[in-house]
C-alpha cells in the first residue's frame, strides 16, 4: 500500500506543479510513454498530451490545489484514490475519484477520473 500512496501523492504533485519544466519532469517520471488520461472534461495521451491538459486545468483554475482525500486503495495493477480541489481561499471546490492502471515498470499507464458534485 505504500507504493499506492506514493503514486497518488506524486500524481497530485504533478497536477499542483506550476513550473512547466518541473511539471513535465514529474509527468515523465510518473506516466508511461503512451499513458492515457480521461475524465468527463478532457482527455490526453502520452507525456505531451497529459502535460498539456494539466497545464490547461491550471490555467482554468488559477491558484487551486489538489489534495489527497483519504487513503488510496490498490490491488493487482489497479489503484484508486479520492482527491479534493481547493480554491485559493482553501475552500473545497470539487471532489473526485481517479482510477489508474499501473504498468509493468511501476508507472501509471492510464488514469480515468470521475468528478463528484461541487464540494
Feature annotation, model-predicted:
Residues 16, 58-119:
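A beta-strand edge to alpha-helix "cap/lid" segment located at domain peripheries
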Residues 1-30:
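Short acidic-aromatic low-complexity motifs
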Residues 11, 31, 37, 81-83, ...:
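Aromatic side chains
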Residues 22-77:
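A solvent-exposed, acidic/Ser-Thr-rich amphipathic alpha-helical stretch
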Amino acid at each position: 500500500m505504500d507504493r499506492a500512496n506514493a503514486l497518488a501523492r506524486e500524481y497530485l504533485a504533478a497536477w499542483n506543479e506550476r513550473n512547466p519544466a518541473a511539471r513535465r519532469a514529474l509527468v515523465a517520471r510518473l506516466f508511461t510513454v503512451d499513458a492515457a488520461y480521461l475524465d468527463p472534461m478532457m482527455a490526453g495521451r502520452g507525456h505531451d498530451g497529459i502535460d498539456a491538459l494539466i497545464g490547461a486545468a491550471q490555467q482554468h483554475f488559477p491558484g487551486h490545489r489538489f489534495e489527497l482525500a483519504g487513503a488510496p486503495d490498490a490491488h493487482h495493477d489497479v489503484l484508486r484514490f479520492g482527491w479534493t480541489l481547493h480554491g485559493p481561499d482553501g475552500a473545497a471546490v470539487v471532489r473526485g475519484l481517479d482510477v489508474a492502471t499501473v504498468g509493468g515498470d511501476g508507472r501509471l499507464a492510464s488514469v480515468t477520473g470521475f468528478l463528484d458534485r461541487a464540494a
